[in-house]
Regions:
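Secondary-structure transition motif
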Residues: 1-131
Length: 131
């Protein structure tokens, strides 16, 4: 599998598809999200963006799941992230994130029952805990 990425441009508050990453020069080539076939690419520096990797999985509606996405799983909001110690994408329920020992779950066991409802950058209200 070739890893896919998307990027959040901090200053523009804009989500885009990543078409190329240059680790030597620390630049990322981007296109408007969903329009990589006919877009005009531009390059941005690493420190101008938040880079998010695709999990390689799709939700129950066939939508690609990226780290930073917020999914609905059995009526609860959960954040998708990378767990380095276990080399796996996980989800943690948003209402438990403030707990010191918040439970995490491997995404590969639940992705077909999840639905992507937004992400932490474009939909910060989903990130908030009510109560």
């Amino acid at each position: 599998m070739i890893p896919r990425y998307r990027a959040w441009i901090k200053s523009l508050k804009w989500m885009c598809d990543v078409t190329n990453i240059s680790f030597d020069s620390k630049f990322v080539d981007i296109c408007q999200q969903g329009d990589t076939e006919r877009c005009t690419e531009m390059s941005v520096e690493f420190d101008e963006i938040k880079l998010m990797q695709s999990t390689g999985l799709k939700d129950k509606n066939g939508k690609e799941i990226f780290e930073g996405d917020i999914v609905d799983y059995k009526g609860r909001k959960a954040l998708v992230s990378w767990h380095g110690s276990y080399a796996s994408f996980i989800y943690r329920f948003v209402d438990e994130l403030q707990k010191r020992n918040a439970e995490w779950n491997p995404l590969y066991l639940a992705y077909m029952r999840c639905e992507v409802i937004g992400n932490i950058y474009e939909n910060p209200e989903l990130w908030e805990v009510n109560g």
